Amino acid sequence: MLKLLKTIMRAGTATVKYPFAPLEVSPGFRGKPDLMPSQCIACGACACACPANALTIQTDDQQNSRTWQLYLGRCIYCGRCEEVCPTRAIQLTNNFELTVTNKADLYTRATFHLQRCSRCERPFAPQKTIALAAELLAQQQNAPQNREMLWAQASVCPECKQRATLINDDTDVLLVAKEQL
């Protein structure tokens, strides 16, 4: 018995003082995903990549908004959302203490405004996504005077662009046909 007591005294404390002392986690620990709405462009890549369907994106045309929502009750902390985010708006934290008394506290939401088409006035994409695309194109072309033109092109929905292209193609085909006669 004394031998066992000596061994225990030499070994020291085997347990940690958690929750009274903070528990250290390893650097690669995958905890609660944290969204930075200021960086998010509401592209939906994270929702497509989430295998547990914990992330959802809902578009409301009536309110002209897109809502990003994370339900921590479904999250498996795989880190796919962090990997696919093009703007690094989602970061996995070291936070693992997710006990709540209210189920609503397990939800994280962010709302983003949608851009309306300059021709048909229907909402079609988040304003931040279009602004980022126009900015990236302007940087590649190194032409600040084209920014307004790029923004004008980016603020037209795909359906209106397609309609305009088809109309122009038909007109061009008719003009070529008349010239051949």
Swiss-Prot record:
Domain of life according to the entry:
Bacteria
Which Pfam family is one of those matched by this entry?
Fer4_7
Give the matching SUPFAM superfamilies.
4Fe-4S ferredoxins
Gene3D superfamilies (UniProt xref): 3.30.70.3270
Q: Does the keyword GTP-binding apply?
A: no
Q: Name one GO molecular function term.
A: metal ion binding
Q: Which residues are [4Fe-4S] cluster 1-binding?
A: 40, 43, 46, 50
Q: Which UniProt keywords apply?
A: 4Fe-4S, Electron transport, Iron, Iron-sulfur, Metal-binding, Repeat, Transport
Function text:
Probable electron transfer protein for hydrogenase 4.
Q: This chain belongs to which protein, by name?
A: Hydrogenase-4 component H
Q: Which organism is it from?
A: Escherichia coli (strain K12)
Identify the taxonomic lineage of the organism of origin: Bacteria, Pseudomonadati, Pseudomonadota, Gammaproteobacteria, Enterobacterales
**What gene is it encoded by?**
hyfH
